[in-house]
C-alpha cells in the first residue's frame, strides 16, 4: 500500500457494503489547491471557487467509466464571470477563471451573479453530452446537485469544501437497480 502524504491529491472510489447499490467517490486536492493559489495569483475567494470546481470535475470524472474529458463550467454576469474545470480520464486537471480585478464580494451569489452552469462529458469515442442548469444555487456543490436532480437518471449528491490550502469533496450516488 502506498503511504499518502498531506501534499498529495487523492481520489478514491468505494462501493458500500452497508448501503448496497450505492457508490461513493471522495477527493482531496492539496497539491492542486495550492498550485491554483500560487501559480495563478488569484484572490482567495476566486481560488476557493476554482478549487471547488476542480473537485467537482475530479469527482465526476472518477464516478464515470469513460475515456475522455469532463468539463464543469459556470458563466455569469457577476464579478467572477467564468469558472472552468477540465479533468481527463487519465487524471489531468486544468482550472481557470475570469474575474473583475476590482473584486470585493465574498459570498457565492455576489461573486457569480446570474448565468448558467454546465457539465460536459466529452468521450474520446461516442457522442458529446452537455447538461445545463441556471446558476441560481448558493454554492458550486448546490449547482452540481441541481444539475444531478434535473439532468441525471441516478440519485446523486455532492459536497465540496475549500480553504485556499486544500480542498475536499464527496459524491454519493445511488446506482440503478435492475
Stretches with model-predicted labels:
Residues 2-178:
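Interaction interfaces in information-processing and related assembly proteins
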Amino acid at each position: 500500500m502506498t503511504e499518502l502524504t498531506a501534499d498529495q491529491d487523492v481520489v478514491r472510489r468505494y462501493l458500500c457494503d452497508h448501503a448496497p447499490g450505492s457508490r461513493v467517490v471522495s477527493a482531496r486536492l492539496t497539491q492542486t489547491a495550492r498550485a491554483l493559489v500560487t501559480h495563478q495569483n488569484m484572490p482567495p475567494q476566486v481560488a476557493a471557487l476554482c478549487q471547488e470546481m476542480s473537485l467537482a470535475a475530479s469527482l465526476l470524472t472518477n464516478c464515470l467509466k469513460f475515456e475522455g474529458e469532463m468539463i464543469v463550467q459556470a458563466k455569469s454576469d457577476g464579478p467572477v464571470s467564468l469558472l472552468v474545470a477540465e479533468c481527463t480520464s487519465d487524471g489531468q486537471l486544468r482550472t481557470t477563471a475570469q474575474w473583475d480585478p476590482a473584486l470585493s464580494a465574498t459570498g457565492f451569489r455576489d461573486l457569480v451573479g446570474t448565468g448558467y452552469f454546465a457539465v460536459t462529458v466529452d468521450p474520446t469515442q461516442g457522442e458529446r453530452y452537455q447538461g445545463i442548469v441556471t446558476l441560481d444555487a448558493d454554492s458550486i456543490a448546490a449547482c452540481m446537485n441541481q444539475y444531478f436532480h434535473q439532468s441525471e437518471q441516478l440519485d446523486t449528491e455532492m459536497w465540496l469544501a475549500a480553504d485556499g490550502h486544500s480542498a475536499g469533496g464527496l459524491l454519493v450516488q445511488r446506482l440503478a437497480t435492475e
